[in-house]
Amino acid sequence: MRRLAAELDTGAASLYVYFKDTDSLYSAVLDELLGSLSLVRGRKPWRERLVSLLTAYVDLLTAYPPLAKTALFTRPSGPSSVGLWEAMLALLSEGAIVGRDAAWAGDLLLQRATATAAEEGERRLGTNTVAADEQVTEVIEGLSPKRYPHLASLSNEMMSGTPTTRLIWSFEVFLNGITATRNKP
């Protein structure tokens, strides 16, 4: 709060008139940022629109790593957050995912999206991310096939794919599981 107050050329106490703590400030900023999301409408299939919405959410948060981390630990409840949830639930409803299944599916999908954004955001801030990736690749490729037969046989696949490709694949996996288990106790 002090750092922001200094940038705004005001005292930290003046910010507390509007926000009870840093978390509430970040939550408000996050909600404002979410307002810039385009809530996907159109004629494309519901799954495609849902994956597009979630991917746009990840892209938005990834551009602001501190807010992505904030989104992991806060439950924003501002109008833009509520609008995001409403859009998600409407899309799930189009896929006949309703009630508890929709509520839990939305939570699961947003958890995945938010965690991915926080991780990717941190990677973008990091100075040695390429070196770290190379180190992990080197370790995996150097594994003994006798001791680690599964990892060794999949060494090329373990680090394959772009972050976006892997993210979309994960959403599809979740949606396949969600649709397969809907309406079950």
Task: List where the protein language model places each region.
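Hydrophobic alpha-helical connector segments
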Residues: 38-83, 102, 106-109
